[in-house]
A protein has these predicted regions:
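Short, low-hydrophobicity acidic/polar segments
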Residues: 77-191
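Tryptophan-paired
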Residues: 67-125, 208-297
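A short beta-turn/strand-edge loop motif at beta-sheet boundaries
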Residues: 57-63, 205-212
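C-terminal motif of bacterial Sec signal peptides marking the signal peptidase cleavage site
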Residues: 25-28
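N-terminal secretory signal peptides that target proteins for export/translocation
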Residues: 1-11
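Bacterial signal peptide processing site
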Residues: 30-34
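Sec-dependent signal peptide hydrophobic core
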Residues: 13-21
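A short, Gly/Thr-enriched small/hydrophobic beta-strand-prone motif that recurs across taxa
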Residues: 35-54, 189-203
Length: 297
């Protein structure tokens, strides 16, 4: 008799625990039992890293201030987009545990992202040339997603301002979202804007030089970047310095003994083409304004 009672008590306790567990699961998900409980989301948490840099360290939180994520289905058709950015009131992207929460229906998805130093809307409102993204329409193919740099008749008019840094990233594969689950995926960002500082110094008559005597330019057909970081076919653009200055080296009497001329430039990413396609490579040219001579090419 005692054995039967123990057996019945054990199974009664087991059934009670399973019932309690089921109630907890139902009560914590999607507010099935009570309206005041938090909902259970279906979708994805997207994490971001920017470690493709000379420091070889993740600098996403320090550098990126705004991003736009574009969501595509498994066939590469546009579904939706979502933005996140720092502001004067909140700076979520500076948090090391930042993740973008996307509420999605169950299915398989691709994610593509463009990022800037600030919110995309703030970037567009600022002075100078900037990369513009044509927002896709519902059902549009991912192959049409791209960013295009401002230009006027082939000249990138920077208005004495550096380009706002552009990053691009893409999910490595298809991400599957299941019902009542949040999956995690990480997008690695690559910087698409580059910076170069040029310095000119004369060996003969080292003090007889000024940045005002020279013009600088870089030409390259690199103003349109696809969702996969590829360069689209484009016109050849001309980039000019956004800032120039001289550095003087003086003796104790204050006389200039040497001078160095400097020019700071920013431009879109460069690609090194093989010799057979050398005409597509970027070209740096420096001209002497007084003589018209091309001193560097």
């Amino acid at each position: 008799m005692a054995k039967k009672m123990t057996f019945g008590w054990y199974h009664g306790m087991k059934a009670g625990l399973l019932g309690l567990l089921s109630c907890c699961l139902l009560g914590s998900c999607d507010s099935l039992m009570h309206d005041d409980l938090p909902p259970c989301f279906t979708g994805a948490y997207l994490h971001f890293v920017y470690d493709y840099n000379i420091q070889r360290a993740d600098m996403f939180n320090d550098h990126v201030g705004g991003l736009v994520v574009f969501v595509y289905d498994e066939n590469g058709k546009f579904v939706t987009r979502q933005e996140a950015a720092n502001s004067s009131l909140a700076q979520p992207l500076k948090s090391h545990d930042f993740a973008m929460q996307l509420q999605l229906q169950p299915g398989k998805y691709h994610f593509a992202a463009f990022a800037w130093q600030k919110a995309y809307s703030e970037t567009l409102a600022a002075r100078g040339a900037k990369f513009r993204v044509e927002m896709p329409q519902q059902g549009e193919d991912i192959s049409r997603l791209h960013a295009t740099l401002d230009r006027q008749q082939g000249i990138v008019e920077n208005q004495a301002m550096p380009l706002d840094t552009l990053w691009q990233g893409l999910s490595k594969g298809i991400v599957e979202v299941k019902s009542l689950e949040m999956v995690h995926d990480t997008i690695s960002l690559v910087r698409d804007t580059k910076e170069l500082t040029l310095s000119l110094h004369q060996i003969d008559a080292p003090a007889d030089i000024s940045v005002e005597d020279f013009s600088f330019e870089i030409t390259c057909a690199n103003g349109t970047i696809g969702h996969d970081n590829s360069l689209w076919e484009d016109e050849r653009l001309t980039y000019k310095p956004y800032f120039t200055w001289d550095t003087d080296f003086r003796d104790e009497a204050g006389n200039v003994k040497e001078r160095t001329a400097h020019a700071a430039m920013m431009f879109s990413r460069l690609v090194l083409y093989p010799v057979a396609q050398n005409e597509q490579n970027a070209m740096l040219s420096i001209f002497n304004k007084k003589t018209g001579e091309e001193v560097v090419r």
